Amino acid sequence: RAESPISSGYHFGSRIVIKDNFLYASIGERGQGMIAQDITNHPGSIIRIHLDGSIPQDNPKFTIKPKWLPEVIQIGVRNPQGMYLSPFDDEVYISNHGAKGGDFFGRVEFGGNYGWKIIGWGGTNYIGTKIGDGTAWKANFTKPLWTWTPSIAPSNILIYNGDLYPEWKGDVLVTSLKYKTLYKLNFKNNEVSSQNIIFEDLIGRIRDIEVNSKGELFLINSNSNASLWKMSKE
Protein backbone atom coordinates (compact mmCIF):
# COMPACT_ATOMS: atom_id res chain seq x y z
CA ARG A 1 0.00 0.00 0.00
CA ALA A 2 1.21 3.51 -0.82
CA GLU A 3 2.27 5.36 2.31
CA SER A 4 1.44 7.77 3.65
CA PRO A 5 -2.23 8.22 2.64
CA ILE A 6 -2.72 11.80 1.40
CA SER A 7 -6.04 13.52 0.83
CA SER A 8 -5.23 15.28 -2.43
CA GLY A 9 -6.43 15.23 -6.00
CA TYR A 10 -3.04 16.19 -7.42
CA HIS A 11 0.02 14.49 -8.90
CA PHE A 12 -0.67 10.78 -8.86
CA GLY A 13 2.03 9.74 -11.32
CA SER A 14 0.26 6.64 -12.63
CA ARG A 15 2.39 4.43 -14.89
CA ILE A 16 3.41 0.79 -14.54
CA VAL A 17 6.12 -1.03 -16.51
CA ILE A 18 7.08 -4.72 -16.37
CA LYS A 19 10.77 -5.50 -16.83
CA ASP A 20 12.45 -8.88 -16.20
CA ASN A 21 9.59 -10.02 -13.94
CA PHE A 22 9.82 -6.82 -11.90
CA LEU A 23 7.06 -4.22 -11.66
CA TYR A 24 8.07 -0.56 -11.81
CA ALA A 25 5.55 2.12 -10.79
CA SER A 26 5.76 5.91 -10.90
CA ILE A 27 4.35 7.66 -7.84
CA GLY A 28 3.56 11.40 -7.84
CA GLU A 29 4.21 13.58 -4.81
CA ARG A 30 0.50 14.44 -4.48
CA GLY A 31 1.20 18.17 -4.46
CA GLN A 32 3.20 17.93 -1.24
CA GLY A 33 6.53 19.25 -2.56
CA MET A 34 9.37 18.25 -0.26
CA ILE A 35 7.77 14.90 0.57
CA ALA A 36 9.58 13.77 -2.60
CA GLN A 37 12.79 13.96 -0.52
CA ASP A 38 11.31 12.01 2.41
CA ILE A 39 12.84 8.55 2.21
CA THR A 40 10.21 7.15 4.60
CA ASN A 41 7.31 7.82 2.18
CA HIS A 42 6.30 6.71 -1.30
CA PRO A 43 5.08 10.00 -2.85
CA GLY A 44 7.55 11.40 -5.35
CA SER A 45 9.32 8.12 -6.07
CA ILE A 46 9.77 5.23 -8.48
CA ILE A 47 9.21 1.80 -6.92
CA ARG A 48 10.31 -1.68 -8.00
CA ILE A 49 8.81 -4.91 -6.70
CA HIS A 50 8.47 -8.52 -7.81
CA LEU A 51 5.28 -9.44 -9.64
CA ASP A 52 4.10 -11.30 -6.54
CA GLY A 53 4.49 -8.13 -4.46
CA SER A 54 7.66 -9.15 -2.65
CA ILE A 55 10.70 -6.88 -2.45
CA PRO A 56 13.80 -7.49 -4.60
CA GLN A 57 16.80 -7.98 -2.38
CA ASP A 58 19.00 -5.98 -4.75
CA ASN A 59 16.94 -2.77 -4.38
CA PRO A 60 18.85 0.29 -3.09
CA LYS A 61 17.89 -0.29 0.55
CA PHE A 62 19.88 -3.51 0.59
CA THR A 63 22.84 -2.15 -1.35
CA ILE A 64 23.53 1.61 -1.30
CA LYS A 65 20.60 3.37 0.45
CA PRO A 66 19.96 1.57 3.77
CA LYS A 67 17.53 4.22 5.08
CA TRP A 68 15.20 4.09 2.08
CA LEU A 69 11.93 2.18 1.95
CA PRO A 70 12.78 -1.25 0.53
CA GLU A 71 10.62 -0.93 -2.60
CA VAL A 72 11.87 2.54 -3.63
CA ILE A 73 14.59 2.75 -6.28
CA GLN A 74 14.50 6.49 -7.09
CA ILE A 75 13.21 9.62 -5.36
CA GLY A 76 12.76 13.31 -6.14
CA VAL A 77 10.12 13.27 -8.89
CA ARG A 78 7.03 15.49 -8.95
CA ASN A 79 4.40 13.94 -11.21
CA PRO A 80 5.84 11.25 -13.49
CA GLN A 81 2.89 10.44 -15.75
CA GLY A 82 4.94 8.82 -18.50
CA MET A 83 7.01 5.63 -18.25
CA TYR A 84 8.39 3.27 -20.90
CA LEU A 85 10.75 0.32 -21.17
CA SER A 86 13.12 0.92 -24.06
CA PRO A 87 13.34 -1.98 -26.54
CA PHE A 88 16.85 -0.78 -27.42
CA ASP A 89 18.78 -0.59 -24.13
CA ASP A 90 16.30 -2.26 -21.74
CA GLU A 91 16.28 0.85 -19.53
CA VAL A 92 13.15 2.41 -18.01
CA TYR A 93 12.48 6.04 -18.92
CA ILE A 94 10.00 8.57 -17.52
CA SER A 95 8.42 11.89 -18.33
CA ASN A 96 7.71 14.19 -15.40
CA HIS A 97 5.65 17.34 -14.92
CA GLY A 98 7.47 20.32 -13.49
CA ALA A 99 5.65 23.28 -12.00
CA LYS A 100 5.67 26.46 -14.12
CA GLY A 101 8.26 25.04 -16.51
CA GLY A 102 10.72 22.26 -15.81
CA ASP A 103 8.93 19.29 -17.39
CA PHE A 104 11.45 16.62 -18.31
CA PHE A 105 12.29 13.32 -19.98
CA GLY A 106 14.83 11.15 -18.18
CA ARG A 107 16.09 7.73 -17.23
CA VAL A 108 15.17 5.81 -14.08
CA GLU A 109 18.41 5.66 -12.13
CA PHE A 110 18.96 3.00 -9.47
CA GLY A 111 19.39 4.84 -6.16
CA GLY A 112 19.05 8.20 -7.89
CA ASN A 113 17.36 11.44 -6.84
CA TYR A 114 15.89 13.88 -9.38
CA GLY A 115 15.86 16.60 -6.73
CA TRP A 116 12.27 17.83 -6.39
CA LYS A 117 11.63 20.22 -4.62
CA ILE A 118 15.20 21.31 -3.97
CA ILE A 119 15.50 22.00 -7.69
CA GLY A 120 12.88 22.66 -10.36
CA TRP A 121 14.65 21.72 -13.64
CA GLY A 122 14.38 25.28 -14.94
CA GLY A 123 10.84 26.00 -13.78
CA THR A 124 9.41 28.24 -11.06
CA ASN A 125 6.52 28.02 -8.64
CA TYR A 126 3.17 28.96 -10.17
CA ILE A 127 3.27 32.38 -8.51
CA GLY A 128 6.64 33.02 -10.16
CA THR A 129 8.91 32.53 -7.15
CA LYS A 130 12.06 30.43 -7.28
CA ILE A 131 12.11 26.72 -6.56
CA GLY A 132 14.96 26.34 -4.09
CA ASP A 133 17.65 28.82 -5.09
CA GLY A 134 16.43 28.84 -8.67
CA THR A 135 19.08 26.43 -9.95
CA ALA A 136 17.82 24.16 -12.72
CA TRP A 137 20.06 21.27 -11.69
CA LYS A 138 22.71 20.51 -9.06
CA ALA A 139 25.51 17.97 -8.87
CA ASN A 140 24.62 14.76 -7.03
CA PHE A 141 21.10 14.79 -8.49
CA THR A 142 20.03 12.81 -11.54
CA LYS A 143 20.14 15.07 -14.58
CA PRO A 144 17.20 14.96 -17.00
CA LEU A 145 17.94 14.12 -20.62
CA TRP A 146 15.60 16.86 -21.90
CA THR A 147 13.58 19.62 -20.26
CA TRP A 148 10.75 21.91 -21.35
CA THR A 149 10.24 25.49 -20.22
CA PRO A 150 7.50 26.62 -20.68
CA SER A 151 5.78 23.41 -19.60
CA ILE A 152 4.15 21.14 -22.16
CA ALA A 153 2.43 18.87 -19.58
CA PRO A 154 3.85 15.53 -20.84
CA SER A 155 1.31 12.77 -20.27
CA ASN A 156 3.12 9.71 -21.63
CA ILE A 157 6.09 8.59 -23.70
CA LEU A 158 6.86 5.86 -26.22
CA ILE A 159 10.25 4.87 -27.63
CA TYR A 160 9.46 3.90 -31.20
CA ASN A 161 10.64 0.57 -32.63
CA GLY A 162 8.13 0.00 -35.42
CA ASP A 163 8.53 -0.43 -39.16
CA LEU A 164 5.91 2.04 -40.38
CA TYR A 165 8.14 5.03 -39.57
CA PRO A 166 11.64 3.52 -39.83
CA GLU A 167 13.31 6.91 -39.63
CA TRP A 168 11.88 7.30 -36.10
CA LYS A 169 13.40 4.13 -34.66
CA GLY A 170 14.90 4.84 -31.26
CA ASP A 171 13.27 8.25 -30.97
CA VAL A 172 10.92 9.24 -28.16
CA LEU A 173 7.31 10.23 -28.82
CA VAL A 174 5.90 12.51 -26.12
CA THR A 175 2.22 13.36 -25.75
CA SER A 176 1.30 16.81 -24.46
CA LEU A 177 -1.81 17.86 -22.61
CA LYS A 178 -1.12 21.59 -22.49
CA TYR A 179 -0.31 22.18 -26.14
CA LYS A 180 -2.32 19.23 -27.53
CA THR A 181 0.82 18.23 -29.37
CA LEU A 182 2.76 15.09 -30.27
CA TYR A 183 6.49 15.74 -29.95
CA LYS A 184 9.38 13.60 -31.16
CA LEU A 185 12.71 13.70 -29.33
CA ASN A 186 15.66 12.71 -31.49
CA PHE A 187 17.32 10.22 -29.14
CA LYS A 188 20.61 8.57 -30.04
CA ASN A 189 23.56 7.33 -27.96
CA ASN A 190 21.73 8.12 -24.71
CA GLU A 191 21.37 11.79 -25.65
CA VAL A 192 18.52 13.94 -26.95
CA SER A 193 19.81 16.24 -29.67
CA SER A 194 16.62 18.06 -30.66
CA GLN A 195 12.86 17.82 -30.86
CA ASN A 196 10.27 18.01 -33.63
CA ILE A 197 6.53 18.63 -33.58
CA ILE A 198 4.67 15.82 -35.37
CA PHE A 199 1.29 17.54 -35.10
CA GLU A 200 -0.46 20.00 -32.81
CA ASP A 201 -3.99 20.93 -31.83
CA LEU A 202 -5.71 18.28 -33.95
CA ILE A 203 -7.32 15.87 -31.48
CA GLY A 204 -7.43 17.75 -28.17
CA ARG A 205 -5.40 17.14 -25.02
CA ILE A 206 -3.39 13.99 -25.73
CA ARG A 207 -3.38 11.57 -22.81
CA ASP A 208 -1.72 8.39 -24.09
CA ILE A 209 0.05 6.76 -27.03
CA GLU A 210 0.52 3.10 -27.97
CA VAL A 211 2.02 1.17 -30.88
CA ASN A 212 0.94 -2.16 -32.38
CA SER A 213 2.99 -4.93 -34.00
CA LYS A 214 2.72 -3.21 -37.40
CA GLY A 215 4.25 -0.01 -36.05
CA GLU A 216 0.93 1.85 -36.27
CA LEU A 217 0.40 4.52 -33.62
CA PHE A 218 -2.76 5.08 -31.60
CA LEU A 219 -3.54 8.04 -29.37
CA ILE A 220 -6.28 8.83 -26.90
CA ASN A 221 -7.29 12.27 -25.73
CA SER A 222 -8.62 13.34 -22.35
CA ASN A 223 -11.54 15.42 -23.55
CA SER A 224 -14.91 14.93 -21.86
CA ASN A 225 -15.85 12.58 -24.71
CA ALA A 226 -12.42 10.92 -24.85
CA SER A 227 -11.75 9.28 -28.19
CA LEU A 228 -9.18 6.92 -29.72
CA TRP A 229 -7.28 8.02 -32.83
CA LYS A 230 -5.13 6.10 -35.30
CA MET A 231 -2.30 8.10 -36.77
CA SER A 232 -2.04 8.17 -40.55
CA LYS A 233 1.20 8.32 -42.48
CA GLU A 234 -0.47 10.30 -45.25
Language-model regions, residue ranges each:
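Short, solvent-exposed coil/turn segments at beta-strand boundaries
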Residues: 20, 214-215
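Short loop/turn motifs that cap or connect beta-strands within the blades
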Residues: 1-4, 61, 198-200
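Short, exposed beta-strand-loop hairpins at the edges of beta-sheets
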Residues: 217-222
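Conserved catalytic network of the ASCE P-loop NTPase/AAA+ motor domain
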Residues: 211
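Beta-propeller domain segments
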Residues: 29-196, 204, 214, 226, ...
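Asp-box/WD-like beta-propeller blade repeats and closely related beta-sheet repeat scaffolds
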Residues: 1-18
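Repeated scaffold domains used in trafficking and secretory/extracellular systems
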Residues: 206-208
